[in-house]
């Protein structure tokens, strides 16, 4: 399965394109990835990105972003919601793709049990925190190999699909980069919200 991971030995935007349409399976739930965001790395690396957790270098928190590709990088947003990323690029070079939304195909009842009985199906895995909640992804999954069939969370790549791109959600730096990609027409895709701390549109990296 590491042959599949080699498909992610590319820049983060290309990796994001390749992850759209992939099947993500976790703890009784599976779905198609419909929205992602690419993140680069350190200032002197090939893809400097001030919005990335890895921008200031290797830390205990972000080491998974430095490879190898195909590993799950988890973190808590605002100290509450678990978010999931897939490492990409050459081993030792920081880059990852944030999984923002998925269209669930199997285990919808399991996901609804985790998210709430009244949550609309299209919203079960809409947004990074909701995706992890629906899939049962936790901080304990940090660093697992997504292409290992014995992992609690696995990934299966397919042929890339046509994507739409635009600015990333909620970042205050590098806020104009069109590094958010999604599948058009999917109701599971989240709404775009620009960070109130970001410069005016057109004035940021």
From Swiss-Prot:
CDD domains annotated for this entry?
Answer: AAG
The UniProt entry, under Gene3D superfamilies, shows: Methylpurine-DNA glycosylase (MPG)
Q: Which domain of life is it from?
A: Bacteria
Name any Gene Ontology BP term. Answer: base-excision repair
The answer, when asked if DNA repair is one of the entry's keywords, is yes
**Enzyme Commission numbers on file:** 3.2.2.-
Q: Which InterPro entries match?
A: Formyl_transferase-like_C_sf (IPR011034), MPG (IPR003180), MPG_sf (IPR036995)
| Matches recorded under SUPFAM superfamilies | FMT C-terminal domain-like
Keyword terms, alphabetized: DNA damage, DNA repair, Hydrolase
Q: Keyword DNA repair on this protein?
A: yes
MF annotations from Gene Ontology: alkylbase DNA N-glycosylase activity; DNA binding
Concerning NCBIfam families, the annotation shows:
3mg, PRK00802.1-3
* Protein family: Belongs to the DNA glycosylase MPG family.
* PANTHER family for this protein: DNA-3-METHYLADENINE GLYCOSYLASE
Q: Which HAMAP family match?
A: 3MGH (MF_00527)
Q: What is this protein called?
A: Putative 3-methyladenine DNA glycosylase
Which species is this record about? Mycolicibacterium paratuberculosis (strain ATCC BAA-968 / K-10)
Kindly list the organism's lineage: Bacteria, Bacillati, Actinomycetota, Actinomycetes, Mycobacteriales
